[in-house]
Amino acid sequence: MGADDGAISADKVDIRLQPLNKNGAQDETDEEAADQIQLRVYKQRWIVLLAVALLNNTNTMSWIGYAPSGNYVNSFYGESSAAWLSMVYMMCTIPVGMFAMWAGREWGLRTAVLIAGWANGIGAVIRVISSLDFVPQDLRFPICMTGQGIAAIAYPFIMFLPTKVAGSWFPDTQRAIATSIGVMSNPLGVLMANLISPAIVKSPEHVIWLNIFTCVPSLIAMLIATFGVNRSEPKIPPTFSASKPQMDFVSGMKSCFSSKQYIILLIVMGGGIGMFNCLYTVMLELLCPSGYSNFFSGVCAALMIVGGVFGAAASSIFVDRTKLYEETLKIALGAAVIFGLIFLQLTLHQGYSVILGVTCLLFGVLGLATYPIGLELASECTFPVSEATSTGLIVLSGQIQSVIYVFIMKNFARPLQPDRMHIQVCQLTPDDTINTPKDNTMSIMIFSLLATLLVLTLVVLFKPVYKRLEAERGNRATADKAKELSNQNKDRITLQAESAVEPLQKK
């Protein structure tokens, strides 16, 4: 066989391996399709979520920690100090919240985590200083309020982080459970505060130990946030929606407030958050007039949270698999309001400890189950608005409504009837004029009416469109089709060119 034969043989091999390529644009399209479907999840997502969860947990402990031991805190810092140390969180969130949402969108997740971590840690240290022996009595409360105010500044930066982390770092099959872990660290902080605060604080002098208890984990969270979160987003996104550019802050705000379904969710979910915050704040004041102790108040709050952890985890796994966000939210919130109303009515009577505990548990299972679902729905209704904006507005609405509900509970309460004074356990001593027991009947009636109106609004008017899921399904279908076409083209042989080659002849 001569040189020409060898050339023909080589050409034949080349032809058989040559894929079909009608024009130069085909290769470019295939490359774009490959880039389009490039998704990846990183193990670092769990470190980022841990940092956010710890910040949420420790910041909430700082917020709620004084309420379960309010009578001792009032004696140590001054009259009504426990309520003000809780209220400062709600008041700081409102003015700082808008800036925090803008900063989270413009500066990124890592900057928000750093601001939250350092504000939380510095505030905790100042609270410890306020309770040291050398601090004069008249300076204790101002110093403590300063530290609490600095820690409160961290909360608006924390409030949108769970959904932001879930949307930026986690695949769509883990988004709801990631959001649940992030947001449920908040009520877990409430649980720890309500269990440990009454156990630590047995007299006014023990308040310093409560401050130390909240300070140590706050400093740990600050260190993890500083060294564990080194970037705002992964290099390669985990989902199609995470790869899509999000609206700027102003456009996102306009989009949110032009959506009827989002506005309904904003009011209802904000109301739910506000009512939970209010109950945490005034739990002792609700129960002590009917003879229920500080410890029992802490147990009730703990049962709510324990139930809520299981409820939120179960609901998150369920909606991750089924995507039945709307149905789950409506059923859970409706049932939660029923058990919540029963609980409130029972607080007006003595001797119902077991039933109060059961209703607290069921209220927590169903009520807190709605929290992560509602925040995920906010992202669904407003996509491609940044999660920092859509969920931040809901939590901000919750803080505003918290102030309203606490105001209602305190200002519509009346002096306790004389024939019930022998039942109450609010006063530390018979001549205690700081911890005055109240009759909460009117407050509870107004509170119950508002809760009923909120759930009816949700059930009747809320009919969302899952914009984020629809976008991901469309992108996934397009990418799968492009990938399939690309694979077919690569496997196809140019038969026409092959047939033009003469078979080799033996000499």
Swiss-Prot record:
Gene3D superfamilies: MFS general substrate transporter like domains. One of its GO terms (molecular function) is transmembrane transporter activity. Residues 477-507 are annotated as: Disordered. One of its GO terms (cellular component) is membrane. CDD domains: MFS_MFSD7. It is a multi-pass membrane protein. The keyword NAD does not apply. Keywords: Membrane, Transmembrane, Transmembrane helix. The chain crosses the membrane at residues 46-66, 83-103, 112-132, 141-161, 181-201, 207-227, 263-283, 299-319, 328-348, 354-374, 389-409, 442-462. Residues 477-493 have a biased composition (Basic and acidic residues). Pfam families: MFS_1. It is found in: Membrane. This is Uncharacterized protein B0416.5. It comes from Caenorhabditis elegans.
